[in-house]
């Protein structure tokens, strides 16, 4: 991987000769507070990322895949090897330079409301979005606020949010695939687009004392049975993002269940697991995993990442930009894991052991 002007490029041959242009933006379902230019506190509409996603789908068409997470929205634009640089420049112009298409935006607003109303009836979707209240409490997320915000969001508020948040300082770019050469002139064009807006943006929140966070249990009626377990990890402020990531990757691997969702940002760290039955998972974190568990996890993670880059570049690219937005370089993480020995890991894990709290959401017909 090579980096020019804060854009990371990775040459990898894929049989379809495609290039995967990936933009990660530090906005998501749970991003409420931002600090603009180190002085202005901006309160974001919680529905902004979902409406932005639908607007981009209407604007960019079939060649784009968009994923909206809790703090990161990822846009993957596929280009052909022969024309990827021109496509890349056009893509950046659409994101950063072109004016908002108001008619498309109105369609995106109405479509977002209709889609949310439809999926909200699904118990698993509702449980997941409800679980963020526990997992992302330090960022001020509430499901009720998201629902209200979606109804309140209008063109003027969206355009204002776009100008403040869709800027290069709040984004990460990663280009992966069958890359042909990029000239100095083309790099200058790209650099000029990215430097067109120079404000700084930082995700906001409040680091509450994890000792004050209680366990919780929520029961709701639903059209289907759902069991969801949420583990929240309260790290000390001095623990680095890299150490948090290593800890979460290794320690959560021993948790039973399916559809695990690990999340890490500056304010919250969590694991959300869908399980067959209601379980108590806190006890798994009373001590670091054993040497044999460590070896299995280490091999499993290396194999998974290698499989992603070979067979699932979209998933791989999403991981890379999300890590970059958390100031973690994928190559550094991989190098750290390769060199990491169990004795060193156990020592680090015992020192940074977080306070683990747990919530369960049970939905029954």
PLM features: residue spans?
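His/Glu-rich zincin catalytic helix
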Residues: 1-61, 163-255, 357-365
């Amino acid at each position: 991987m090579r980096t020019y002007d804060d854009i990371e490029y990775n040459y990898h041959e894929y049989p379809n000769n495609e290039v995967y242009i990936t933009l990660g933006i530090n906005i998501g379902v749970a991003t409420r507070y931002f600090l603009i230019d180190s002085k202005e506190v901006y309160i974001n509409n919680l529905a902004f990322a979902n409406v932005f996603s639908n607007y981009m789908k209407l604007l960019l068409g079939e060649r784009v895949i968009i994923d909206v997470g809790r703090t990161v929205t990822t846009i993957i634009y596929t280009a052909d090897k022969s024309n990827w640089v021109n496509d890349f420049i056009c893509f950046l112009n659409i994101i950063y330079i072109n004016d908002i298409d108001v008619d498309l935006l109105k369609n995106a607003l109405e479509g977002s409301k209709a889609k949310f109303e439809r999926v909200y009836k699904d118990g698993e979707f509702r449980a997941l979005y409800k679980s963020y209240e526990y997992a992302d409490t330090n960022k001020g997320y509430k499901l009720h606020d998201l629902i209200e915000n979606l109804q309140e969001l209008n063109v003027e508020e969206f355009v204002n949010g776009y100008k403040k948040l869709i800027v290069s300082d709040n984004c990460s770019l990663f280009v992966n695939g069958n890359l042909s050469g990029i000239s100095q002139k083309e790099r200058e064009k790209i650099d000029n687009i990215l430097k067109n807006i120079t404000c700084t943006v930082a995700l906001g929140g409040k680091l509450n004392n994890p000792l004050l966070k209680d366990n919780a249990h929520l029961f709701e009626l639903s059209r289907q049975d759902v069991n969801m377990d949420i583990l929240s990890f309260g790290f000390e402020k001095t623990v680095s993002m890299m150490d948090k990531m290593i800890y979460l990757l290794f320690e959560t691997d021993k948790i039973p269940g399916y559809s695990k969702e690990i999340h890490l940002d500056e304010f919250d760290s969590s694991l959300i697991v869908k399980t067959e039955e209601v379980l108590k998972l806190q006890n798994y974190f009373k001590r670091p995993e054993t040497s044999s568990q460590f070896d299995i996890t280490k091999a499993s993670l290396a194999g998974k990442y290698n499989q992603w880059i070979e067979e699932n570049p979209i998933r791989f690219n999403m991981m890379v930009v999300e890590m970059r937005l958390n100031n973690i370089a994928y190559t550094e993480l991989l190098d750290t894991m390769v060199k990491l020995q169990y004795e060193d890991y156990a020592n680090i894990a015992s020192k940074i052991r977080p306070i683990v709290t747990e919530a369960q959401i049970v939905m029954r017909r």
